[in-house]
Amino acid sequence: MIIKKFLQKKIIRFINSQKVLKFFFYYHKFFNNKGLKDIGFDFSTKKNRKFIVQDIIDTNKYNSYLEIGCFDDELFDFIKINNKIGVDPVTGGTVRLTSDQFFSKNNEYFDCIFIDGLHTYNQVKKDIQNSLKFLNNNGVILLHDCLPNNFYEQATPRCQFTWNGDVWKAIVECRTNKDLDVYTCY
């Protein structure tokens, strides 16, 4: 009975997330008030982050990729690109350092940077600032875990298995920077 309720809840959440995606896609398409450029990706049709990241890389013909926080290499192994570096202090990727340690030694620039490291506002803010220093012209920085489903998923310190942390605060702050185009999707 518990498993059935759990599965029903997940299915309803998945169906609703598809509706939300379509709504936000069309809302931003028709009522976009910042005059932001189109990044060439229809968020309403491809939900999985692996396909989103790969499609952005392919569409823009990017050649270099940096992933901060690789954990089990699910995304890192999926991405097909000539030059890719994965940074994680514990497991996954190609470099065993914290993101701060990596950026202090790095001299390489990237077209696409995916941030999924330590899920705290302060660290993500530093990761964004450091990434901007090593981002090629017309490059993109992508962030994961920006939309917690409830209070506990965003609480710091971490108090449950599923955890987004307070990454969302970094997105809010980035939106105040007039030099950055910030896009969000569910």
Q: How would you describe each model-predicted region?
A:
Residues 1-114, 118-186:
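A short alpha-helical cap/connector motif
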